[in-house]
Design a protein with these regions (language model features):
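Primarily short, surface-exposed interaction patches in extracytoplasmic proteins
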Residues: 68-104, 108, 112-142, 150, ...
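N-terminal secretory signal peptides that target proteins for export/translocation
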Residues: 1-3
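Metal- or metallocofactor-binding catalytic centers and their adjacent structured scaffolds
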Residues: 145
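Intrinsically disordered, low-complexity acidic Ser/Thr-rich regulatory segments
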Residues: 339-343, 501-546, 550
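N-terminal pre-domain segments of enzymes
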Residues: 29-81
Length: 648
């Protein structure tokens, strides 16, 4: 079942009666080719000042493993067919080429396809074109951009400040590069759990620093994210809805409790004495405006944060009330399920925990990530909620759940290979189901669920419509700031800190950034992929209004509608930019001579399909009534439809 297509009355009702659009300088935009009165488009800005670029090397999927992936996809379909028969479910028809190409671009690349990509795919008669397109999308930059947004929501990635005066950019960059190089998921997670050092020296340490000073909460978050299990209630008392006891929670937390995240200013590493106080005293001599901290805290405090083993031992709380322990009793590390973790002499218990959690023998590690990614593609997990597995949790299809878990292990936690398998199933390639599944409802996956795009997918789709090369812009690499912020407090001086601070604030760096961003800027908005914008964006930004999370809690992004979203779509700068003369949409439309061809470009660009006869007639009527302005009205109408905003 497809989303209802735009009716004649809906198109006319949505169409504006004003001009095609007006630039901020008041120049009317005209679509007529060859019109001698058309003003030349404004000159492009000068190229930006050269600044360091982050090298992007995207690891492609291997063509040699495609046959096995297709065989696994067929196995998935066989298990689903048996489930359909068991529950007397009729699967949805196969999605049209137009529906499939739009869906797979959104799911894997995080954006709608261009109209040329739609046309090429639909016109292609190759029987393997779907499998080849899946491989292509998994091998391009859009994949890492898309799944960076996914992990940013789960890992609560923040560019600006990870924790007290510690920037998150190196950690965010490490996550992105892990996706680009297709680092196996078990290695990705192990790298975060076992990391040591400052975020500048070992960016993966950002995971532990994210919950600095909260070791018990950190354990709860880790088990929830990577093992799909919520044990947080047992932090204060025996879990009321699961089998975990408070003591078991503390035994798990004992693995990582001896991990420090901040050195004391008087740490022996700094040679004795309070190094921060000493530097602050010296700063008063160097900078007469020094007020004790402020902008200098990113040097003085930020460089105290370092993941290290401090040997601290965890004890039960002072008010512990159960018979299996005593208040303030020392707790030894012990796993709550699966095989025990082997703590070797002389090795941090945290390393044993990291090995145990990421082991293929861990009963919930592979199951959790396979279930999470299934939900990413189908709109619902085989087990719901995906982060609250219990011993008695019943998968919708136990045999399929077990097979997908085993496949994750077989492909050695290669997430691209796993996604390749699922996307090649007949089940994924069926029409979407327009059903609202609430907790407790049975859903047997006759097709993927119809769902609204994420905030990042909406934003990136607008960028694809407006910008010629949406993946071209890369965020400034972390090393630009690293060479200035990363200092050894034991060896530095107030003068060095002062000079580094001056350089960070210098007009040269500011001008370089402004020049770099200028070609991608429009009315205060940076027109680049969401993954290349600061994360998260401020509350008033388009992304936040469409549900991007504030990165304060795990997975709190939203696809719910709101009045601010309607206002953004009706009259926001992101909508107006589509009608600017340098917009890719305008260029593509004006490249066609006939109004009929132009209408097809508009529909295929925005909805990835040609207009119906009724829609074509409505569009022609609008253009006839308002001349060239009518084309802009049609564009405006289509981006304001549910069909544009939903993944079907």
């Amino acid at each position: 079942m497809a989303v209802r297509q735009l009716s004649l009355s809906a198109l006319v009702a949505l169409a504006l009666v004003g001009d095609w659009g007006v630039t901020e300088h008041g120049t009317a935009m005209v679509l007529a080719q060859g019109n001698k009165n058309v003003k030349a488009p404004p000159k492009k800005p000068e190229p930006p000042v050269p600044v360091p670029e982050r090298k992007v090397h995207v690891t492609a999927v291997s063509t040699s493993t495609r046959p096995r992936a297709l065989a696994s996809a067929a196995k998935v379909d066989g298990l689903m067919d048996a489930n359909y028969k068991k529950f007397k479910v009729t699967p949805n028809p196969t999605a049209s080429d137009e529906q499939f190409v739009r869906r797979v671009y959104l799911d894997l690349a995080g954006t709608i396809p261009t109209y040329k990509q739609v046309r090429l795919f639909v016109a292609n008669s190759d029987t393997e074109k779907k499998a080849k397109l899946i491989d292509l999308l998994l091998s391009q930059e859009g994949y890492s951009s898309n799944f960076y947004n996914y992990w940013a929501d789960i890992l609560r990635l923040k560019d600006n400040q990870l924790t007290n005066n510690v920037p998150g950019k190196p950690y965010c960059e490490w996550v992105k590069e892990s996706l680009e190089t297709n680092k196996p998921y078990d290695q990705f997670v192990y790298g975060m759990l076992s990391a040591e050092g400052k975020v500048w020296d070992n960016p993966a340490s950002g995971y532990i620093l994210r919950d600095s000073g909260m070791p018990l909460d950190a354990m709860n978050n880790t088990v929830r994210i990577f093992l799909g299990t919520q044990i947080g209630c047992a932090q204060c008392h025996n879990h009321p809805f699961d089998r975990w006891t408070q003591k078991e929670f503390y035994e798990m937390a004992a693995f990582t409790f001896g991990t420090g995240t901040r050195r004391g200013a008087g740490d022996k590493k700094f040679g004795g004495g309070n190094v921060v106080n000493k530097l602050r005293d010296d700063m008063k001599k160097v900078d007469e405006k020094f007020d004790g901290g402020g902008k200098y805290n990113r040097f003085l405090i930020g460089n105290l944060f370092e993941v290290h083993d401090n040997g601290a031992k965890l004890v039960l709380p002072h008010d512990y009330q159960y018979d299996d322990g005593k208040p303030k009793q020392s707790v030894s590390p012990k796993t709550i399920f699966g095989p025990p973790a082997k703590v070797e002499k002389g090795v941090s218990p945290r390393i044993a925990f990291a090995k145990w959690l990421t082991s293929p023998d861990n009963p919930r590690f592979a199951k959790t990530i396979s279930n999470r990614l299934w939900k990413r593609l189908f709109g619902a997990g085989l087990i719901e909620p995906v982060d609250d597995l219990k011993d008695d949790s019943q998968p919708e299809n136990p045999e399929l759940t077990d097979f997908l878990t085993s496949e994750m292990v077989r492909v050695k936690f290669d997430l691209k290979e796993y996604l390749r398998i699922v996307c090649n199933t007949k089940a994924y390639q069926r029409e979407a189901t327009q059903a609202e599944v609430t907790p407790g409802d049975e859903f047997h996956f006759p097709g993927p669920l119809l769902r609204r795009m994420t905030a990042e997918q909406v934003w990136d789709s607008f960028i694809t419509l407006a910008v010629t090369k949406p993946d071209e812009y890369q965020k400034e690499p972390a090393r630009v700031e690293a060479k200035l912020l990363n200092i050894d407090l034991a060896k530095t001086s107030a003068q060095v800190i002062y000079e580094h601070n001056q350089e960070l604030a210098s007009s040269d760096i500011k001008k370089s950034r402004e020049a770099r961003n200028k070609p991608y800027s429009y009315k205060g908005q940076l027109l680049v992929r969401a993954s290349e914008l600061p994360s998260p964006q401020p509350p008033g930004h388009f992304l936040r209004q469409f549900g991007q999370s504030d990165r304060e809690a795990i997975e709190v992004s939203s696809e719910d509608g709101s009045v601010p979203q309607v206002l953004q779509m009706f009259n926001g700068p992101i909508t107006h930019m589509l009608l600017e003369p340098e917009s890719l949409m305008v260029k593509n439309v004006t490249s066609e001579k006939s109004s009929d061809a132009r209408i097809e470009v508009i529909f295929q660009s925005i909805l990835a399909r040609k207009p119906t006869a009724a829609e074509r007639q409505a569009a022609q009527s609008e253009i006839k009534a308002h001349s060239d302005a009518g084309f802009g009205n049609v564009i405006w109408a289509l981006v304001n439809t549910r069909e544009f905003l939903f993944v079907q």
